[in-house]
């Protein structure tokens, strides 16, 4: 039997949205379809894969719907950690279905499963004292200050656009469902995991996990996963064709390998 090759593939949340005119669920599904075609190519070449993905734009949409529903119909708002879980399920569904379809048409006997994944962060991570990650929509100053007083939000002003909530971006310490992911991989099942960097949780004094309002960098979480499963390859999929130096400047230059 040939030696197994392990790969962790991190898909950018923005790579599921081609441009501002292609943001619908169907648009994202079609982008996922294209991505899964390439992943299936790797699997056909003998790779066992775990797939991580970003969720920034998708969580932004979920939060916006929540804010509108709250203002218009008085619906309860959705906490950030639950938004992350929602997006893991939705994006995982799109990837899972497209991979299953690829396997069927290629006659590959393979299964794929999405794992709703929690990632432990340190409640004393310095980023909690200096949150910088903007989330949600813009607010006027009165609304922003009300949120600060009543809900303990951190907010910043964006000149000319209003106020916006900011949250911490702590480093990932431990993947709670790692054993589940490892079991899937050991049995030849593709695992979709650490979506959006994982749902950030902290541990209380009694050893219980609690969701927290934060955003974990999906590349850090996927890198941690690659280390833990001793992957042979860590691959990051983005919306651009290659790595650039001086990105988005007149001096931008692609790096070829």
Q: Which positions does each model-derived feature cover?
A:
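Glycine-rich nucleotide/cofactor/substrate-binding loop typically near the N-terminus or early
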Residues: 37-131
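Generic structural signal for well-ordered, non-membrane alpha-helical segments
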Residues: 28, 32-35, 84-92, 173-178, ...
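N-terminal glycine-/serine-/threonine-rich phosphate-binding loop
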Residues: 1-50, 62-68, 183-186
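An N-terminal domain-start capping segment
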Residues: 22, 87, 93, 145-147, ...
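Short, well-ordered amphipathic alpha-helical segments that serve as non-catalytic structural scaffolds
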Residues: 32-42, 95-98, 219-230
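General beta-strand structural signal in soluble alpha/beta enzymes
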Residues: 9, 51-53, 108-116, 191-195, ...
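Active-site phosphate/oxyanion-binding loops
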Residues: 17-18, 60-81, 129-190, 194-257
């Amino acid at each position: 039997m040939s030696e197994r090759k392990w790969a962790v593939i991190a898909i950018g949340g923005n790579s599921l949205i081609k441009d501002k005119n292609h943001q619908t669920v169907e648009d994202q599904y079609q982008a996922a379809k294209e991505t899964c075609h390439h992943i299936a190519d790797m699997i056909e070449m003998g790779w066992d894969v775990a797939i991580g993905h970003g969720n920034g734009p998708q969580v932004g949409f979920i939060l916006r719907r929540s804010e509108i529903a709250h203002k218009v119909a008085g619906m309860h708002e959705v906490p950030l950690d639950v938004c992350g879980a929602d997006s893991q399920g939705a994006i995982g569904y799109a990837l899972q279905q497209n991979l299953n379809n690829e396997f069927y048409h290629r006659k590959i006997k393979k299964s794929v499963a999405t794992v709703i994944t929690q990632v432990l962060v340190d409640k004393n991570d310095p980023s909690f004292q200096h949150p910088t990650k903007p989330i949600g929509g813009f607010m006027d100053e009165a609304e922003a200050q009300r949120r600060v007083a009543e809900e303990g939000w951190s907010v910043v002003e964006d000149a000319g656009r209003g106020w916006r909530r900011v949250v911490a971006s702590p480093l990932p310490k431990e993947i709670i469902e790692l054993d589940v992911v490892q079991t899937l991989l050991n049995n030849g099942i593709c695992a979709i995991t650490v979506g959006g960097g994982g749902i950030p949780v902290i541990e209380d004094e009694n050893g219980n996990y609690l969701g927290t309002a934060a955003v974990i960098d999906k590349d850090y979480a996927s890198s941690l996963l690659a280390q833990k499963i001793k992957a042979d390859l860590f691959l990051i999929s983005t919306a651009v064709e290659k790595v650039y130096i001086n990105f988005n400047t007149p001096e931008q230059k692609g790096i070829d390998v």
